[in-house]
Amino acid sequence: MITTATQDTTSKTITVVVSRGQSRNPEKRGLEQAVVELAGKVEGVDVIVIPHLYDLPKSSESFAKLKDIEGDLVVVSWIFSRAAHWVLDRNGICGKVGKTQWTDEDKADDDSGESVASEAPSIEVEPTEVVDRVTDLYPRPDRQVYCLDLKAQNDPKVFVSELRRIMGLKEPSSDTVHLPIVGGQVVQVEEKTGRRWYPVIDFDRCTNCMECIDFCLFGVYGVDHGENILVEQPDNCRKGCPACSRVCPENAIIFPQHKAPAIAGAEVDGDEGFKIDLSQLFGAPTGSDDPIATAARERDEQLLLAGRDAVGIDDQLKKRQSDLAAGPKDRLDNLIDSLEAFDI
């Protein structure tokens, strides 16, 4: 069901999508509503309020509504910005990643003081071989999709300030705040959803290597008519299992509801990734387990729960382990080596 609250209309410039969270926490609901109300007062903005992005099926009324929009989008949700972008992409709402001036980690930085990266030594990075990504071969439409994470800020005015920046609008002065409000329309889409768990592929990183389809034994992955990887049966995925994300060579597989930021879609490439607790970067247990061993164990747990036999680290995973061990060190390896060299 769709309900609409219409104000004085102007020519539409941009659509803001506010995705409600799964929680009924009154503070979170209050933040959502405040963003809706403030954004709805900006000239040239239409607002659509939908249920939680990740829980919506592909056939949902919400996604059908969003597919009809051709221009730029600003999407505000409770999952990491990167995760939100690729949830939309897999459901047919495609575009290029819009650049924002603040990140998912802004609030965490303000609360925690200096980051690990600020104290880390400079690291020489060896050039890596250029590899074609799926979006290099199949470019997305030439429009911008800006995704903002509600977890990053608790002041609705910050979101609206970023919206105005994206639109190229100046902040309202004290002389204009009392003028009549000229906004767009606010559309609320009401539909029932249930909590889901499935992988989301970041095609800006994916190289179509097929490691995930070879690893997953639950029929989650498939290929399209162009032999590109896709999440074919999302609801076949075992709830709580992120094992395939650990074996992905490009960190292209996202589980938006996972507790580990790197798996949930936080940006971890480059120095900004080192702000995350390195010992828990991929949510692995403390100890000597590598991501491949952890992935194999998680897969076996789900196989046993499904009444099937465990397979452990098979020949393909052993080869992957040996390739990783023989390969050049990455930025994380170099950082850890540098930290170990400190005289502390």
Region annotations inferred by a language model:
Residues 78, 217, 249:
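Short glycine-/small-residue-rich Rossmann-like dinucleotide-binding loops
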Residues 61, 88, 95-96, 106-110, ...:
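Charge-rich, low-complexity amphipathic helices
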Residues 2-4, 9-14, 234-344:
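Flanking helices and flexible, charged tails adjoining ferredoxin-like Fe-S electron-transfer domains
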Residues 186-211, 219-246, 255-264:
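Ferredoxin-like iron-sulfur electron-transfer modules
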